[in-house]
C-alpha cells in the first residue's frame, strides 16, 4: 500500500501501524496555494452587526487581508506585539475557479472552485481604534488559517445552508448558519465582479456569525497566549489552533 486517504487513516493505523507514516505529526498547509486576492466581507451577518454596535450595510463592506496572513488550519495563531485585543471569526471561504468579470448573480456560482473554513483572526485595536482602514488589524502573520480541505461545490450543495461554529478552550462562542448572511455567496461574487476581475485562486471570506470576542457581554473577551481554538463548518472540516505570543 503506497497511498492513504486521510479519511481511512484511522483504520489503516490500526491494521498496519508499522507501515503507516505518523500523519498526526505532519503539518497541514493551507488548502489553496498561490492566492492572488484575499477579499473579506464585513458585517455580513445581521446579528453580528448588532453585537458590534454597527448598522447593517446597504452594500457589502469589502476589505483586503494580506495573503501573507494565510497559514495552515492547525498552525499556531501568533498574538502580535503590543496586542491586547486579538479576536476570532469563523467564516466560510469561497475559492474562485475561473475568472469572473461583470457576472450576473444567476451564473455566479459557476465560477466557484470550492469552499473552505477560514478563521479571520482580527486585532480589534489595530482594526478599529488606530484610524485608517481595517487591513492592519486583519493582516498580521498567521491571521488567516485556511482549510483543512477545499471542498468542491457538488459535495457542498447549497452554500447558504451550512452550520459553522467556533470554540475557545472548549467553550462554544460562535454557533451560526450561513443562511443568515445579509449577502449570499452568489450576490457577493456578482457584486465584486462589477469592480474588479476575480481570478482563479482568489479567496472571498464571507463574514462571520455572532459570538466574536468583541461582542461578549458584559465586556469583550480576547485571546490570550496558551489558549486553543477549535472551529469548523459543516461538510468542510475542522481547524485546531494554539494561541502563542510573538517572540
Where are these regions (language model features)?
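Catalytic-pocket segment enriched in acidic/His residues
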Residues: 27, 31, 48, 54, ...
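Structural signature of FAD isoalloxazine-binding scaffolds in flavoprotein oxidoreductases
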Residues: 55-73, 86-88, 223-235
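Short, structured patches in soluble enzyme cores that scaffold and shape functional sites
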Residues: 65-67, 74, 81, 88-98, ...
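Generic beta-strand structural signal
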Residues: 36-39, 59-61, 75-77, 84-92, ...
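Short helix-loop capping/hinge motifs at secondary-structure junctions, enriched
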Residues: 100-103, 155-157
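Short catalytic-site patches enriched in acidic/histidine residues
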Residues: 61-80, 100-101, 142-151, 210-214, ...
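N-terminal accessory regions of nucleic-acid-interacting proteins
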Residues: 101-116
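N-terminal non-catalytic cap/leader segment that marks the start of a structured domain
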Residues: 1-60, 228-230
